[in-house]
């Protein structure tokens, strides 16, 4: 996917702790101002529980595609692939995610898919995560950063 914005036009923020409860709900709601697609990944290293299978089945109503991929924001595999689920990000899907998981980093097997990424309409990553490593980050354009800072998200810190 082509990203026409140069890296200097971005502000990079790394997650400090986790985005939990009402903050997670608000975060998913706010993200819709900039993002239209989300993705989650099925980890081959851990089977999904019955709850995880139900989570994935329910996600199908928002699904755009499922494709075996070797790369997504934050991860590059060598010699193998994982199923990557892309789904539309809207009020209903954001509500489903926030009801299904108590926090950003709780999106992981065995009860859920993992590595939530939120993508702008041009396909560039706004949020990336590697949940089993408890790592998440935002790559914001300057105007997005200004608007998001109005809410003062204390769960992220700047990095270069």
Short names for language-model regions:
Residues 1-160:
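Structured alpha/beta or helical-core interaction and ligand-binding surfaces enriched in interleaved
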